[in-house]
Amino acid sequence: MPKLKTKSGAKKRFKVTATGKVMSAQRGKRHGMIKRTKKQIRQLRGTRVIFKTDGDNIKKYFLPNA
């Protein structure tokens, strides 16, 4: 069985923590920001932990070596 390669797009978008959780940037910051309040825009900064089931799928299919 050959080694599985990590998907390069996922490598740039996701980070796996030491405890195995998957982190990613907040969604919803590409367009349509004029409708949001300053507080809403500010709260979209930084990263977040992805739900466990989604994180498991990301690790299985896109980040097999993580």
Curated annotation (Swiss-Prot):
Gene3D superfamilies: 4.10.410.60
Keywords attached to this entry: Ribonucleoprotein, Ribosomal protein
Top-level lineage group: Bacteria
PROSITE patterns the record matches: RIBOSOMAL_L35
Record bears the keyword Ribonucleoprotein: yes
UniProt record similarity statement: Belongs to the bacterial ribosomal protein bL35 family.
Protein's recorded name: Large ribosomal subunit protein bL35
